Amino acid sequence: MERVHLFFHREQLKRKGTAKGLFVTDRSVSPILLTQRDRAEKASYEISWEKSLLGERTLFLNAEQDDPSLMRRRLAYCFFDQIGVPAPVASYSFLTINGQPEGIYLNIKNHQPAGKRSYGVKTADPRVPLSLFNNDSSAFLHEFFILIRTAGDDELAERIKLYLDVKLFFLWLIGNTCTNQGFYYTFCLNESGRLYVSPMETRSLAVQEWYEEDPLLTKGKTLSSRLLSIPAFRSQYHTLMKNVLKRSFTIERLSPLINEWHLDICQSAADDPFIKKSPFQIEKEQTNILREIEERQDFLQAHLARL
């Protein structure tokens, strides 16, 4: 596990909400701007560079205070990546601040689109509410919305492929149905000029939303509902989800990652002043995640049969 050291004036951070400081690893020493993202006892941080020899611009250090396993968000990002959805890269770091141990953090770097163009949205609803596409949108997104709102099914099925990577959008929805986490996200343009959706970390910590009344994310005044009203797209979505549930969202596929990360956490847990659990309790969290995957798999299979 990488050791990360932050040096800054806590009073400046408390007074202004941001503080200048130093970010130190075995590889580099960099001046940074630090922002505290919440008021938890073990706080989460956003770190920004103006210039970096290693090319970093922003990273997020998440304390994962609401997840005693420290693994669920990392597993979600990794799962998105495995099924082909560009996602943030996450790893573990052990953080010290001004020489004092703060403990294990999830170190997250957002996906950088190849085209360097992206459109952030102000929602964590993965179905993409159509209200997002308003007059304040970019010209491209506004044109996209006009197509969705006015085109008939046949025209939409034909022309939407000029604007949206439909398969990747469906995989984005499937990733959300499986992981059942809360994510902010951004629209990105790929090299062929088509939109895709990528989960992202922001300064605000995403709040988990529940869609148990709509577990397959097919309802509402949303982009997903509009596309899935077309039989060919609904069939494609069904096939993709069936394949993901069979091949990717499985104990066999995900347990090696969970085991590896669990061992990494256990090696540093005793030095984390905020981890109060015994080794047995930490081990139990690993078992809980595997049980959750199995239960979610069964739940989604039952709903998929009615799609």
UniProtKB/Swiss-Prot annotation:
Keywords: Sporulation. Disulfide bonds: none annotated. Its main location: other. InterPro entries: Spore_coat_CotH_CotH2/3/7. This is Inner spore coat protein H-like protein. Belongs to the CotH family. It is found in: Spore coat. It comes from the Bacteria. Transmembrane segments: none annotated.
